[in-house]
């Protein structure tokens, strides 16, 4: 059963329908409780590629270092629907963090076959992310947003963070259509570009 949820729920519906990813016989920390088809099939493929070092969806080095600096052992559970279009982004972001930091463990749960658990936790929307039994996020979420919530929850090891200064030719503020176009145009001209935005797309 999921750590931190034992006092709330005794598993019933989807018992046994789960699997974990291994690399060279060792656990990666990534677990799927349910069958990751539908929108979550890509999450499974990316988890396999990332675990093998071939993934392409990692953020830049400075963000990766923030993930590695998170304190303590972190157990995350994300409840999803296989028809949810916002769920894969959250699942893939947390799986990527799990690959980067061996102290993070992430479990994707298909709410449709674990309905009793969903009811017991009073989950109203998906994706819903629990950190050691505490609800920390509901709905659409970007990598940086989720990381900030984990930093607030667990803190960071300052000795593992790197204070680096990077120089850019162009800094674009805003990730809307105009900002994205400006960034793409500048990058195509061979310039080093940084985009400062809460999310791409406005």
Segments (PLM) and residue ranges:
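Short, small-residue-biased leader/transition segments that mark boundaries at the very start
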Residues: 2-9
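Structural micro-motif
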Residues: 11-30, 118-132
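Extreme N-terminal leader/targeting segments of oxidoreductases
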Residues: 98-106, 112-169
């Amino acid at each position: 059963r999921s750590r931190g949820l034992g006092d709330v729920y005794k598993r019933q519906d989807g018992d046994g329908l789960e699997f974990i990813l291994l690399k060279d016989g060792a656990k990666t920390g990534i677990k799927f409780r349910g069958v990751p088809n539908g929108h979550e099939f890509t999450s499974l493929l990316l988890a396999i590629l990332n675990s093998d070092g071939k993934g392409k969806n990692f953020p830049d080095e400075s963000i990766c270092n923030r993930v590695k600096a998170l304190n303590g052992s972190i157990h995350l559970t994300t409840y999803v629907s296989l028809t949810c279009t916002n769920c894969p982004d959250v699942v893939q972001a947390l799986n990527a963090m799990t690959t980067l930091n061996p102290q993070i463990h992430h479990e994707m749960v298909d709410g449709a076959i674990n309905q009793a658990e969903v009811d017991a936790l009073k989950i109203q929307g998906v994706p819903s992310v629990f950190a050691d039994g505490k609800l920390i996020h509901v709905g659409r979420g970007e990598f940086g947003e989720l990381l900030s919530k984990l930093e607030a929850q667990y803190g960071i090891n300052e000795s593992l963070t790197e204070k680096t200064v990077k120089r850019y030719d162009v800094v674009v503020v805003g990730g809307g259509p105009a900002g994205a176009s400006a960034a793409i145009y500048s990058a195509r001209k061979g310039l080093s570009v940084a985009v400062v935005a809460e999310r791409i797309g406005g």
